[in-house]
UniProtKB/Swiss-Prot annotation:
Menadione, hydroquinone and 2,4,6-trihydroxybenzoate are not substrates and inhibit the reverse reaction by 33%, 31% and 49% respectively. 100% inhibited by 0.1 mM p-chloromercuribenzoate and by 0.1 mM CuCl(2). GO terms for cellular component: cytoplasm. This is Phloroglucinol reductase. It catalyses: dihydrophloroglucinol + NADP(+) = 1,3,5-trihydroxybenzene + NADPH. It comes from Eubacterium oxidoreducens. GO terms for molecular function: oxidoreductase activity, acting on the CH-OH group of donors, NAD or NADP as acceptor; phloroglucinol reductase activity; quinone binding. InterPro entries: NAD(P)-bd_dom_sf, Sc_DH/Rdtase_CS, SDR_fam. Optimum temperature is 40 degrees Celsius for the forward reaction.
Length: 272
């Protein structure tokens, strides 16, 4: 048990010197979280499927003083993930934080959606989360050297799912199913990992946030924007930066007693 002293209180949100692996790093959310870790003193491993975009991101980050490297990988492929982890450990010696920020959706009415498209969504949003979390957790366990650390001291895993894991929507059968499955998978993984290995795993469940794919929803004069805002007590749609603090909290000692949670960060969407 850590006493409530000045050192603990002033360092509880620190990720200084940690190694953070961020998937979907070239996307809006992944880039913000990777920068947040880097600005706060973590070494960052950026991963995604587009090496060109990753290389550009490394150049940008290093110009801002962030210690980082980029490794391309498909998180839905076991061999890719195993190599990714091996290369990350070769670069920085360990992995302390995993932030899972990749995802995919292809909306369609259930009567029109092909089984192949549904399966692709499940692979991208659920199977890939299982694979990356499984093998990073194994790396975190290996780093312990047989010791059982205090809660949260074995590693932190943060997975971006969605408020759609909690509420259905027409045309989103595949997406809602995959995100709901990911939330329950995270809860079950916590039962496997937290007490024995000190690895905390949690989900953040955001509402719609600005990205290349959702930019069209941010036209304040559109009916889509106006209708969505009726369900947002906070009065606006989200920016990816809105979730940086939540991810930092779940990646730091401040959240050592939190695991298996699907944390709502929807601007109040779920209460209306």
């Amino acid at each position: 048990m850590v006493p409530c002293n000045k050192e603990f209180v002033t360092n509880m949100f620190s990720v200084e010197g940690k190694v953070a692996l961020v998937t979907g790093a070239t996307g809006a959310l992944g880039k913000v979280l990777a920068k947040t870790y880097g600005y706060n003193g973590a070494k960052v491993v950026l991963t995604g499927r587009n090496q060109g975009k990753l290389d550009a991101l490394v150049e940008e980050f290093k110009a801002e003083g962030i210690d980082c490297t980029a490794i391309s990988a498909d998180p839905a492929k076991e061999d890719d993930v195993k190599k990714l982890i091996a290369d990350a450990v070769k670069a920085y010696g360990r992995i302390d934080i995993l932030a899972v920020c990749h995802g995919f959706n292809k909306p369609a009415n259930i009567l029109e959606q092909s089984v192949e498209d549904w399966q692709y969504i499940m692979d991208a949003d659920c199977k890939s989360v299982y694979i990356i979390c499984k093998y990073v957790a194994q790396q975190m366990v290996d780093q312990l050297g047989g010791k059982t650390p205090e809660s949260g001291k074995g590693g932190k895993i943060v997975v971006a799912t969605s408020q759609r894991s909690k509420r259905g929507m027409a045309g989103y059968t595949g997406y809602c199913t995959s995100k709901g499955g990911a939330d329950m998978m995270i809860a079950s993984m916590a039962c496997d990992l937290s007490a024995k290995y000190g690895i905390n795993i949690n989900a953040i469940c955001p509402t719609v946030f600005r990205s290349e794919l959702t930019e069209w929803m941010f036209d304040v004069n559109s009916e889509v924007y106006k209708n969505f805002l009726k369900r947002e007590p906070i009065g606006r749609l989200a920016e990816p930066e809105d979730f940086a603090g939540y991810a930092m909290f779940l990646s730091s000692d401040a959240s050592n007693f939190i695991t298996g949670a699907a944390c709502d960060c929807s601007g109040g969407y779920l209460v209306c």
